[in-house]
From Swiss-Prot:
Residues reported to bind ATP: G51, I52, S53, G54, G55, I56, D57, S58, T168, K197, T219
Protein name: NH(3)-dependent NAD(+) synthetase
Gene that encodes it: nadE
Organismal lineage: Bacteria, Pseudomonadati, Pseudomonadota, Betaproteobacteria, Burkholderiales
EC number in record: 6.3.1.5
Family classification: Belongs to the NAD synthetase family.
Metabolic or biological pathway: Cofactor biosynthesis; NAD(+) biosynthesis; NAD(+) from deamido-NAD(+) (ammonia route): step 1/1
Signal peptide residue numbers: none
Length: 284
């Protein structure tokens, strides 16, 4: 791909993902807190629900949600934020999860261990005759089951509390398609949408997060065989490079092509379910 064509695609993708050419942390916090508060009030809902993993994305989204419901209560509208701990058995980074909760200061915290449900599903699939190519493939499938069990738990609480599920997706994860479809990608409201990873970190700092939380190595931590595997190992490039791509900064052509390959391969994750009328590969 020529450089002009590559640059044009970068601009188009950044616009699609709502990445602004400018950024002010205080302004963005105000916009996003107001968005969540307005959404709840307009929809007549009373709660926000979010799983807090111990990473910077869920911590930042959780703090924004907590501030939004506090704003609503100050205006006379009753709303609460429910933070959920959703470990698969013992959590490797338990201390980080506790640090995140201390930053978020949620109205309420519920803990649900997804291990029994995830393991039961894996066993039920085996009993039904599903076989895997190897242990690595089985572990990959189990990882996605974990993410989807967490989604089920959050929606169960949201349903019981007349609330919405808050998602943690932002532009850097979205462009790479780095989320489980109908797992952590399943949510009602995305307060971090349009932000690059460095901007999420800047927003967290402005909101008062401490540096160990802000700078924690991002990991989905879904694989049992490779616990705490950094996101960047899966990408083969860094978040700094992904952010440069989205923010229109100078970068190596090969790195830009890597981002474009991930973007093209994961288009289905950013779309609603296809019909014959809207799938690009099928003439309507």
């Amino acid at each position: 791909m020529s450089r002009p064509d590559q640059a044009a695609r970068r601009r188009a993708i950044a616009a699609e993902l709502h990445v602004s050419p400018t950024f002010d942390a205080r302004d963005e916090a105000e916009r996003r807190i107001g968005f969540v508060a307005d959404y709840l009030r307009t929809a007549g809902l009373r709660a926000c629900v979010l799983g807090i993993s111990g990473g910077i994305d869920s911590s930042t989204a959780g703090r924004l949600a907590q501030l939004a419901v506090e704003r609503l209560r100050a205006s006379g509208y009753d709303a609460r934020f429910v933070a959920m701990r959703l470990p698969y058995g013992a959590q490797h980074d338990e201390a980080d999860a506790r640090r995140a909760l201390a930053f978020v200061r949620a109205d309420e915290t519920l803990t649900v261990d997804v291990k029994p449900a995830a393991d039961a599903m894996l066993a039920a699939l085996a009993a039904g005759g599903l076989a895997y190519l190897d242990h690595a493939q089985q572990d990959f499938v189990l990882g996605n089951i974990k993410a989807r069990e967490r989604m089920i738990a959050q929606y169960a609480v949201a349903g019981a509390r007349n609330g919405v599920v808050i998602g943690t997706d932002h532009a850097a994860e979205s462009v790479m398609g780095f989320f489980t479809k109908f797992g952590d990608g399943g949510a009602d409201v995305l307060p971090l949408a349009g932000l690059t990873k460095r901007r999420v970190r800047a927003l967290a700092r402005m909101l008062g997060a401490d540096e160990p939380l802000v700078l924690k190595t991002p990991t989905a931590d879904l694989e049992t065989l490779r616990p705490q595997r950094p996101d960047e190992h899966a990408y083969g490039i860094t978040y700094e490079q992904i952010d440069d791509f989205l923010e229109g900064k100078p970068m190596d052509d090969a790195v830009a092509e890597t981002v474009l390959r991930f973007y093209d391969a994961t288009h289905h994750k950013r779309a609603l379910p296809y019909t014959m009328f809207d799938w690009p590969g099928h003439p309507a």
